[in-house]
């Protein structure tokens, strides 16, 4: 054996809440970013999602995600809406599923002009990490840097709480990835090396993932509760 490589979907995989100012714009960009990193997106919060502030706060508390991706606003644009979203997260004071004594990882990938205010709101209550804006201008997404941060925090905050993780790390020759993220990388590698468009399906125990690479653009979507173990009844329904 030349190398041992491991992926993980333990504990239901990487579960995230994402947020954006406009649901159909930065909200969808944040969702694509998290999905492409191998996460299950539990909810998309947005300033215009029709929910009242207390409903958004209660929803964050209820879900207890592994981490939150906070996005919104183009660079140089208004800061008030994304800071408002940060305040909802701070008011919820959410605790991660694993490691109750740890702070919840929050990734900020929104308007760079709002960074100082987001730090003021979330810096003490969460394990806040800042990265490049996932949508710096309306016409362009920039998902790569935030996806890499998600991978890093998955190892540092989520997998580190899993029983046996340290022992498993001694065996592996590469960092442990979320299983959907690893499958996505396989699809992108095939598309790049063969110079073709690729569509792939990964049928798991609880969810089914669809991957595509068209014109070098990668996308992943998740059909929740469609799988081959305890959600098999939904497939057959």
Regions from the PLM with identified roles:
Residues 188-237:
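Glycine-rich phosphate-binding loop of actin/hexokinase-like ATP-binding domains
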Residues 1-197:
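Nucleotide/phosphate-binding catalytic cleft detector across ATP-hydrolyzing
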